[in-house]
């Protein structure tokens, strides 16, 4: 939310819009990433901790972004009837486009709403950018202003409840444009874990 309302061209990498997750790597044999295999062989030859290396690369490797797109519950997630270069993530039966496309509460629908909001008003493209509460380490917050239009974009980057110090904005009437929590009530004193929203101020 807080990235896509900034200047520049937003992009979505395949699978991001349905919340595809990292592949469950369990051994070096499950990796195709050449850089991972090369470093593994070097560390192993030097008698290093290959288990620690594998744990690191479960999260930090290129293969996580190379798994087949998960379209539906069919073989290979509907990506191909052939043999894909990399196996489909085993969770494809629960995380796929078909499961989400008609669900108004899905990640896919949220991305659609996010794109629609970005395209709905030039304030999100050309509006002046100003940081808000910039010394707050837990929140990333800013306003975009164009002519007489102004929006506030906030994202809580932590798993902790945080407070946003914007008294001059709280006094004004707000219209919630997008919110990743089911409640559209914004409490500036209690920004919930990973809460993100866009409001007109």
Predicted feature residues:
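Carbohydrate-interacting/catalytic domains
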Residues: 9-12, 25-28, 33-201
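Substrate-binding cleft of secreted/luminal carbohydrate-active enzymes
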Residues: 7-19
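Short, small-residue-biased leader/transition segments that mark boundaries at the very start
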Residues: 1-2
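Short, glycine/acidic-enriched loop or turn micro-motifs at the edges of active sites
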Residues: 19-20, 159
């Amino acid at each position: 939310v807080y990235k896509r309302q900034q200047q520049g061209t937003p992009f979505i990498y395949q699978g991001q819009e349905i919340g595809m997750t990292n592949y469950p790597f369990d051994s070096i044999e499950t990796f195709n990433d050449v850089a991972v295999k090369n470093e593994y062989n070097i560390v192993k030859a030097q008698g290093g901790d290959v288990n620690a290396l594998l744990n690191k690369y479960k999260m930090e490797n290129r293969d996580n972004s190379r798994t087949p797109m998960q379209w539906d519950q069919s073989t290979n997630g509907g990506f191909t009837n052939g043999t894909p270069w990399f196996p489909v993530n085993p969770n494809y039966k629960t995380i796929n486009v078909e499961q989400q496309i008609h669900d108004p509460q899905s990640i896919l629908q949220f991305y659609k709403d996010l794109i629609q909001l970005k395209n709905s008003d030039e304030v999100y493209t050309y509006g002046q950018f100003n940081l808000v509460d910039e010394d707050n380490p837990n929140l990333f917050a800013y306003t975009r202003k164009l002519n007489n239009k102004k929006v506030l974009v906030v994202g809580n980057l932590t798993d902790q409840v945080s407070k946003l110090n914007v008294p001059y904005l709280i006094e004004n009437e707000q219209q919630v444009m997008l919110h990743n929590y089911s409640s559209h009530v914004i409490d500036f004193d209690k920004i919930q874990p990973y809460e993100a929203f866009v409001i007109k101020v």
